Design a protein with these regions (language model features):
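C-terminal motif of bacterial Sec signal peptides marking the signal peptidase cleavage site
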Residues: 19-23
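Low-complexity, intrinsically disordered segments exposed to solvent
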Residues: 25-282
């Protein structure tokens, strides 16, 4: 009798255990993938790369050798940034020094350290190559290392200047937030403002792809599926105002990032497995 009771008890325990195990497995399968941190890291890295270009553009405007626009200054750079120009070196070099303490730019970002910008010719001349190298450089306390090159490819069929931009950078996030690595190959088309001397009427259309690792160590790839629009007017220049991008973290579903329809804000939408999540761009 005791043996039968023990058998019944063990059978019940086995059934309950199997039920619990099955329930746990079901919960694991139903776990919602809603992590947008990787998409935010991607946006931070992309924005940082574009910021390097914007600063090098503005710094060179001060000097006629570069054939940059000269009618408008201090679009991003404020009075705490010092610009020096070396004409004696074989490759002309501009250094933008923000100092050892945070320098607030006109775009609302804090910077310190320096950027070294070397160029082989005038910005508007075909095949001119510009190399931007950060030197103990921080933006909003995130350290940026590596380098970026900008090559003038001349005018396209629409008579717009096109630049090939390659970047290989790392971003060491503030407060021990991890490190983002980023390698990208993109093209930037100057779609508006080339014919004027006003920097804030410039608009750029950007295409291309990137790959790297997020701050939590996960690999990713990203592809621009609809050109990202960079509007350099006041209030717009900090973030992309339009465009679509596919961000695919290793082992997870693709994140579809929509930067909006042209509004000058820091809002974007990330779609994961058909569900939309609103994020604020860093």
């Amino acid at each position: 009798m005791k043996t039968k009771q023990l058998t019944i008890v063990l059978t019940v325990v086995a059934i309950i255990s199997a039920s619990i195990f099955s329930s746990c497995r079901k919960k694991e399968k139903e776990e919602i993938d809603n992590d947008t941190a990787g998409a935010s890291d991607q946006s931070l890295a992309s924005s940082s790369v574009n910021d390097l270009t914007s600063i090098s553009d503005e710094a060179a405007k001060t000097y006629t050798i570069s054939s940059f626009k000269t009618a408008e200054t201090n679009a991003i750079l404020s009075s705490c940034a010092t610009i020096t120009f070396d004409t004696l070196a074989a490759a002309k070099t501009i250094t933008v020094n923000f100092g050892a303490t945070n320098c607030l730019g006109n775009d609302g970002r804090y910077r310190r350290g320096a950027l070294k910008i070397a160029f082989t010719g005038k910005y508007r001349d075909s095949l001119t190559l510009i190399t931007v190298t950060p030197q103990s450089y921080f933006v909003n306390d995130n350290q940026i290392t590596g380098s970026k090159t900008i090559k003038n490819l001349g005018h396209n069929a629409a008579n717009h200047l096109v630049y090939e931009i390659n970047a290989n950078i790392s971003i060491i996030k503030a407060s021990g937030g991890g490190t983002i690595t980023w390698q990208s190959a993109r093209q930037r088309e100057w779609t508006a403002g080339e014919s004027t001397l006003t920097w804030s009427d410039d608009i750029y259309s950007i295409t291309g792809s990137a790959n790297g690792t997020t701050s939590n160590g996960n690999t990713f790839t990203s592809v621009i599926t609809s050109p990202l629009i960079r509007n350099m007017s006041i209030g717009c220049r900090r973030h992309f105002t339009q465009g679509l991008l596919q961000h695919t973290p290793g082992g997870k579903a693709t994140r579809y990032i929509d930067f909006g329809n042209g509004a000058c804000d820091s809002d974007a939408t990330v779609t994961i497995n058909g569900t939309n999540y609103n994020i604020t761009l860093p």
